[in-house]
């Protein structure tokens, strides 16, 4: 943090007796604690944060046109520009965050709430402070998982098969994809999920994240990136990759039942259907129905915009590898810019050449332009869905819909 609140602010809060009311310096209502370096109530802290994050101060206009409206218990909602200016004049900055201290009873309550069973590499750690607006927060420590993924990406714990080293980029991508999919259970051997606790979802994610890292290093151009670039690339694409691969596998396995019964192979072992749901209660205080509604639009688009084209096209494994590789480089390029965009353009050109060779040599198909257009339509539809979901997650983060922060903040940004 670039600065800290004055000692008088801190001491006045900590020395206040239960009978003393500490007032918000912005509006003079009862203060909650020190927010952004200023003793303030929750409402003013929330107002300031929303204004800064959404850059609303650029849209605000003074109600009276004089920039001197009163901001107090009666008038704080009347002029947003004057309220924001008063916050700034008092010393509020986004970097200057000092959270109010917790009482012993709240600390005990937090410990009880966080005695959640730990799952694999996802460890819940109580925070010693409060997050914005005074909501209790928990850190999901994924440092051991990050280390595991980086080891794979940097070739320390996973070696390419000798067969894969002799293949072109597209063949190697298909080889790695088929290797993963060979573990897929048939429907009769899958566990049908009624309610899936979110911590079990994280277990599924962990296995898939490691597999996706293994898939990525089959691409020679990816292996040329430096260690930091590899990890940033992975974080940008893994959730999109997982979602698209699982959906295409579901269409391949269940056909039209993906639409009629909402069958979805969320993992190689677990099957979700129309009445299945995810229990988010460990990471949010919102009802599950509210969280589901937040993702309803992008989930609906996944089913309605991709299911039919995938069923009609019935892509081969090499075409699926082509789409996954295209998507990965395009999305990573958009996120990382610079060098990755340039490499991605070259990769996509080489992919097109590899796919051309495959069509001509393996399928004896000379006229494939129409099929290629349909493949790219699916790629573009998935890319749009991914970006929309990313925006949804950003809004969820801004308004603190979840009470868990990840130790690696942007790994779950979509």
UniProtKB/Swiss-Prot annotation:
A zinc finger (NR C4-type) spans 24-44, 62-82. Keywords: DNA-binding, Metal-binding, Nucleus, Receptor, Transcription, Transcription regulation, Zinc, Zinc-finger. SMART domains: HOLI, ZnF_C4. PROSITE patterns: NR_LBD, NUCLEAR_REC_DBD_2. Transmembrane segments: none annotated. It comes from the Eukaryota. GO terms for cellular component: nucleus. One of its GO terms (molecular function) is zinc ion binding. The keyword Cell membrane does not apply. Coiled coil: none annotated. Residues 162-414 form the NR LBD domain. It is found in: Nucleus. It holds the Pfam family Hormone_recep. Residues 21-99 bind DNA. InterPro entries: C.elegans_Orphan_NR, HNF4-like_DBD, NHR-like_dom_sf, Nucl_hrmn_rcpt_lig-bd, Znf_hrmn_rcpt, Znf_NHR/GATA. Orphan nuclear receptor. Belongs to the nuclear hormone receptor family. This is Nuclear hormone receptor family member nhr-213.
